[in-house]
Every structure is written in C-alpha cells, then in structure tokens.
A protein has these predicted regions:
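Phosphate/nucleotide-binding beta-alpha loop and adjacent structural elements of enzyme active sites
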Residues: 1-187
Length: 187
C-alpha cells in the first residue's frame, strides 16, 4: 500500500492504521506539480483542501460553515502522480482529496495505465471554489477507459435551516458526495 498525505497532521492517523511494513507513506501533496495555496481547516473536519471553501455553499448545509472555517493558508509545492519517484505500479487507486481528484487523475495518466480500479470521492455540490463535480469526473473517467462499477456510500445532508431530530448531522435528502469505484472498461 502506498499512501499520499501532504498534511502532516494526518500522517499519524495513517500510521496508526497501517504498519510501516504494510504501507509506504509519501509526504506529498498530489496535484499538478505547481505551487498552490493550501487552505487548512481543523484536522477533524476533513475539509483541508487546495481549493478554497465556498462560503455560500457551506452556508447551504447545516454545520458546514464551522467545518469549513479556514484556520490558515500556506504556500505548498505539489507533485504530479506521474512524477512521484520510487512509486511502484499499482492496480487500485483510492482518493479522497477534497476536490483535487480530477487534477490528480489528469496528471497521473501514465500511472493509471496498469490500474484496474479507482475509488474516488465525488461531489454533487461544489463546497469549494472551482471544485469539479461528479459529472466532470465521470466524463473524464469514461474518456480514459473506465466505467462506473458501484457506489460505496452516498452522503446526503440537510439543507439549512432544516434540522431533523434536533441533530444537524442527521441526513436530509440533498445529495452531497459519494464514494464510487470505477473499473477498466471490459468491452
């Protein structure tokens, strides 16, 4: 297993889950190989991203304004997936990178040639400025020879100010994001 995590605050979680014999952790921000701003949110929020949180989108969902609060902004250097040294070929790729999936895929086409399956977190509603949505990712994945295999998780959220059972985390009907697996098109 190869894991990529540029946010040093999150590396410890990976190492708690996998031993060094099970996983090699690359301390890189995958993207397009250029310098970018990193919008750091609270570690537990899972919303740190290379894309700036979009206030009006966060306000649309209960509780997201707090989750998407940017604590600081840092300049960081990214690396293309195709350019990662000492990375062996892989047959499965899993990504949850807060909107950066499409750029990473586009900058990793050579690495994807032998990859049989890809698991991505895709958004139906852009929570970040210029964040590609599910439609953008799906069109691209099909263009490089992958087809949807299955949805693992479909996350719904309640629209503000609606709260169910007194808990803002209780799901509503608004589609938010999903984990989807793509496989190489067998036809």
């Amino acid at each position: 297993l190869s894991a990529f995590e540029g946010d040093e605050r999150q590396i410890e979680k990976i190492l708690e889950t996998y031993t060094p014999n099970q996983a090699k952790v690359f301390n890189h921000f995958l993207f397009d190989g250029e310098e970018h701003e990193l919008f750091l949110c609270k570690p537990a929020s899972g919303m740190t991203s290379l894309f700036k949180p979009k206030k009006e989108a966060l306000d649309f969902f209960n509780g997201f304004s707090k989750l998407g609060e940017v604590q600081s902004v840092e300049k960081i250097k990214t690396i293309r997936l195709d350019d990662v040294p000492k990375l062996r070929d892989f047959d499965f790729l899993k990504m949850d990178v807060q909107g950066a999936e499409l750029s990473i895929l586009k900058n990793g086409e050579n690495r994807l040639k032998n990859c049989l399956g890809v698991q991505l977190e895709v958004s139906y509603f852009s929570l970040y400025e210029n964040q590609p949505t599910f439609g953008d990712v799906d069109v691209y994945m099909r263009s490089i020879g992958y087809v949807p295999h299955q949805f693992l998780d479909v996350k719904r959220w309640s629209i503000a100010p609606t709260i169910f059972n007194g808990n803002f985390r209780t799901a509503g009907n608004q589609l938010l994001e999903s984990d989807i697996i793509y496989i190489k098109n067998p036809l």
